[in-house]
Amino acid sequence: MNEKNTLFNWFKLVVKRDLVLSFKKIATFMVPLVFFLIVITLFPLALGTEGSFLSTLSSGVIWVAALLASLLAVESIFNEDYRDGTLDQFLISGEPTFILVLAKVLAHWLVTGAPLLLASLISTFFLYLPEGLLFPLLISLLMGTLLLSLLGALGGALTIGKTAILSAVIVLPLSVPILILGVAI
């Protein structure tokens, strides 16, 4: 019982630490959110404002924008901790590594995925999403953005210290099945 409590406290500590650090750097969560909103805003401008045409594309546009926006924040999962030596301290602490990874993924999702989820709720009005598809879209985005954060952790871990584009090249092909399943609502 004491070991479970210690692991949960470790988990909470890492999540809280990452959230505090992320909100100190406003660009960490604002860049993906602003990118998402720009993409959503440009689609009706580029394709016209005909409601029936936009409504057929709306869930796909939201999903593609969410996928591309989440790729912008992939490098921030582990790179800063690697640069300042915190990641090494985490690894030699003796705590299970999976707790660290899950905590960092949850913090990453709370900083990038949750705002995208809220922004997608607003963006459905721009794209004339049919009312019956709103709830399934939000549920699929909830699960999909969590999975994208997990894949982002994989790409971020494989490319620690490298350029951000490399992690995007690794994560993008792996995220295509999530995109296909998410759009098929």
Q: At which residue positions do the language-model features occur?
A:
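Aromatic- and glycine-rich beta-strand/loop motifs that create alpha-glucan
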Residues: 1-31
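Hydrophobic alpha-helical transmembrane segments of multi-pass membrane transport/permease proteins
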Residues: 26-48, 63-67, 170-181
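Membrane-interface alpha-helices at helix entry/exit sites of multi-pass transporters
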Residues: 95-109, 136, 167-169
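Membrane-interfacial helix-loop-helix connectors in multipass membrane proteins
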Residues: 46-57, 121-142, 185
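Hydrophobic alpha-helical transmembrane segments that constitute the membrane-spanning cores
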Residues: 102-127, 147, 179
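Transmembrane helix boundary and interhelical loop/hinge segments in multi-pass membrane proteins
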Residues: 71-91
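A structural motif at transmembrane helix-loop-helix junctions in multipass membrane proteins
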Residues: 143-172
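Long, hydrophobic alpha-helical segments
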Residues: 58-74
